[in-house]
A protein has these predicted regions:
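Hydrophobic h-region of N-terminal signal peptides that target proteins for export
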Residues: 12-21
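Gram-negative/organellar outer-membrane beta-barrel architecture
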Residues: 367, 372, 384-550, 554-557, ...
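Acidic/histidine-enriched alpha-helical segments
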Residues: 238-240, 310-327, 524, 566-569, ...
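Bacterial N-terminal signal peptides that target proteins for export
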Residues: 1-9
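C-terminal outer-membrane beta-barrel translocator/porin domains of Gram-negative envelope proteins
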Residues: 397, 411-420, 447, 534-536, ...
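Patatin-like phospholipase
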Residues: 22-62, 70-390, 405-406
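Flexible glycine-/small-residue-rich
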Residues: 166-169, 178, 278, 343-345, ...
């Protein structure tokens, strides 16, 4: 490609002007301290430096200062940096939990069960303790977004030379990081011990550099600095009156050591240097959501030092030339020639490659790559997934670096409880075990069980048939024994039990993150029994159920328990066919639809579902049921049963209190309105709507790590009143 001679001459003159100007003026080292979220204030300082046309010749950062400094060193525009931190979903980044929209449906299926909100990784069938409190997949992805996926090994080759400061966990020595994978170096500098895992660097295990050198003024002078602009965002000392908690005392103890070294560094500043200390009031080192306030505080403090800063300002022409030099040094991506997977033991590299949105011969689309990596991470096999772009002559090698969990066996446990504060209470203990990657296509075996009022055991072998997992076959076996309450005059007087024992084979297709479709053939023995003497003979009925079915599920709710947006739909059809050996011939279809709408802080969760026997007569064990919490709440559990039914429910709620992320999501207060009906007629008819029971009430609920709690107080037709307290999935 040819360039006009005038363009070449202009660029050359700009470069020569910049070199000459740099030789005449003092070189400026920008030194950014650590301080957790308070370090976002550094961006406000950068905005003022840009407006004042003050160039930066090198940057040194510790902890959060290393993050802002690293982004700056790559040539990232300050406005882009500001937008990135003010729009970031910090709860998601630090929670390290996949967004539900990214989770494949075969993982979402667990949301329909009463498991606690955590998964145990097993090694040799023993739980593996967590290595740290906070995962690092999403925060590392965020750092890669800030640095643009560059291919620079030596930090002197960055548009602005850069150093990050860390501490060696073993020796306590200061580690000056001057080369390597920049996003990992940034993470190493802010890896608070016990919260984030240490990062290997050369022969060190690096953690947050703030504990040894929170402000590297001396390193700034070594790197380039004739003068130093130092920004101190560390937390101020806490007075005695506020040292009342264990956390406050621990934080103060660390802060004493940090401040001691910082004051020694600050004491080396000369009259030619500039020290900027933003005043951030009550904002703390964990207030990442207040990014805009931190940036404003940084701007205010820098403007207060503007007179000192202007000593090093350039003219408009010279500053543009300096910026042009930065842009010409910025990394430019080359086409991808090869993709390789490293560090994978049992997860198939071929499966991972099939899921990556990367095309050979094209320049990397970082946003697209991050999206596909996040979807792979959401499968639940990895602690984190990193990548590197390695330069070649004309192209780049993309290396994917997945870090697998310590085992491929996973366990979940849970609990469900219910009481209507009268004579109906129940509980159940649930547990699940899963072994993943039985073969190179990603086969999984899982077993689930429940002990309590409901007793069940289910096992399935889930075998994908293609690399990307789009199609699968799943043979299964189950025993399921559940109660059916007998209700008279709105009181539960006795209980029947229904047992299904058998198995089947499903073949299906995964609809990406949206859902799945299954076709099944099954054979089960069905039996029901009763606690009432006068119906025991009839209740001893046992019959063979052989047939085929279809299930289709669409699931895009953002939260399965208390959604704010999204849809969920399910179609379930089954035909017990005497031609296949079934003792009875019948059909049933059930359609369930849910949608969440949110206005400001208020959410309306609408549900509509209905079922029909399609003109056949359903056995007692297969009849549709209504009654119980959030299932026509004013009625007792199983009070209404028949061949056809419908239910509509509107649940409007608002979150009234936050729960710490380690304990759950929030507390909700809502209003409930339900109506529905059940008919024993074989065919769906308008008579189903002639007399429709209803229920209205108030719901107090909490989204916790143990599961969703609901306290429902409802009033219905015929002067019905009920209260239900429930732990577990109710709909």
């Amino acid at each position: 490609m040819k360039f006009p001679s005038k363009t070449v001459l202009t660029v050359a003159l700009l470069a020569l002007t910049t070199v000459a100007q740099a030789a005449q003026r003092p070189k400026v080292a920008l030194v950014l301290s650590g301080g957790g979220a308070r370090g976002i204030a550094h961006i406000g300082v950068l905005k003022v430096l840009q407006d004042a046309k003050v160039p930066v010749d090198c940057v040194v950062g510790t902890s959060m200062g290393a993050i802002v400094g690293g982004a700056m060193a790559t040539g990232m525009p300050v406005n882009d940096m500001e937008q990135a931190v003010t729009t970031a979903d910090w709860d998601h980044i630090f929670g390290d939990k996949p967004k539900r929209k990214d989770i494949p449906y075969f993982r979402k299926r667990d949301d329909e069960k009463d498991y606690f909100d955590f998964t145990l990784t097993l090694k040799d069938f023993w739980p593996v303790p967590p290595r740290n409190l906070v995962g690092v997949h999403y925060i590392t992805q965020f750092f890669r977004q800030l640095t643009g996926g560059l291919e620079v090994e030596e930090f002197d080759d960055l548009p602005i030379p850069y150093r990050a400061i860390g501490a060696d966990l073993e020796s306590g020595k200061t580690v000056i990081m001057r080369h390597g994978d920049l996003p990992l170096v940034m993470r190493a500098s802010m890896s608070v011990s016990g919260v984030f895992p240490p990062v290997p660097y050369e022969n060190y295990l690096v953690v947050d550099g703030g504990i040894v050198k929170n402000m590297g003024i001396d390193e700034g002078r070594k790197l380039c600095g004739d003068v130093v602009i130092a920004v101190n965002v560390s937390s101020p000392s806490t007075n005695r009156q506020k040292l009342e908690s264990l956390f406050a005392v621990s934080e103060q103890t660390i802060n004493i050591a940090v401040q001691k070294d910082m004051q020694a560094q600050i004491a080396t500043l000369t009259p030619q240097d500039v020290l900027i200390t933003p005043e951030m009031g009550k904002l703390s080192s964990t207030d990442f959501k207040e990014a805009s306030q931190f940036i404003a505080a940084g701007e205010k403090a820098a403007k207060a030092s503007l007179k000192q800063l202007q000593r090093y300002a350039l003219s408009e022409t010279d500053y543009q030339a300096w910026q042009q030099q930065i842009q010409t040094r910025k990394f430019k991506h080359k086409p991808i020639s090869k993709v390789e997977i490293t560090g994978s033991h049992w997860v198939s590299p071929q499966v991972l490659k099939s899921l990556l949105a990367v095309k050979k011969g094209e320049v990397l689309d970082q946003a697209q790559l991050h999206d596909s990596i996040d979807k792979i991470y959401a499968r639940g096999d990895f602690v984190r997934i990193g990548y590197q772009l390695l330069p070649e002559a004309q192209n780049s090698l993309l290396r994917i670096i997945p870090v697998e969990k310590d085992g491929r066996d996973f366990a979940r446990i849970g609990l469900n409880l219910h009481t209507d504060f009268a004579n109906n209470s129940s509980f159940g203990l649930v547990a699940g075990l899963r072994r993943s990657w039985l073969n190179q296509l990603g086969a999984e075996w899982q077993a689930e069980g429940e002990l309590g009022e409901t007793r069940s055991l289910y096992t399935e072998l889930y075998q994908p048939t293609v690399l990307n997992g789009e199609f699968f076959v799943a043979p299964w076996l189950k025993i399921h024994d559940e109660p059916r309450d007998i209700v008279s005059d709105h009181e539960t007087t006795a209980q029947n039990r229904v047992r299904h024992t058998g198995g089947g084979v499903d073949i299906g297709s995964v609809l990406g993150k949206w859902g799945e479709v299954r076709l099944s053939v099954s054979e089960q023995r069905v039996k029901w029994s009763s606690s009432l003497e006068n119906v025991k003979t009839v209740a001893g009925e046992s019959y063979q159920q052989t047939g085929y079915g279809l299930k289709a599920i669409f699931d895009q709710l953002d939260n399965p328990r208390f959604p704010r947006k999204g849809n969920w739909a399910k179609l379930d059809y089954f035909h017990a066919d005497q031609g296949m050996g079934s003792d009875k011939d019948y059909q049933h279809i059930n359609i369930d639809w849910r949608r969440a709408f949110t206005w400001q802080n208020y959410t309306l969760f609408a549900t509509g579902r209905g079922g029909s026997s399609l003109g056949t007569t359903l056995p007692y064990a297969e009849q549709f049921q209504l009654g119980g919490a959030l299932n026509l709440s004013a009625y007792r559990r199983s009070e209404l049963a028949g061949n056809n039914y419908f239910l509509t429910r509107l649940l409007a709620y608002k979150q009234i209190k936050d729960i710490p992320p380690a304990l759950g999501g929030g507390v909700y207060l809502g209003l409930l309105a339900e109506t529905g009906a059940v008919s024993m007629e074989d065919k769906w008819s308008s008579r189903l709507f002639e007399s429709t029971p209803y229920s209205v009430g108030v719901v107090l609920a909490a989204d916790t790590r143990l599961g969703p709690f609901y306290l429902t107080i409802a009033k219905g037709d015929q002067d019905r009143h009920t209260a239900n307290l429930t732990l577990g999935v109710t709909y």
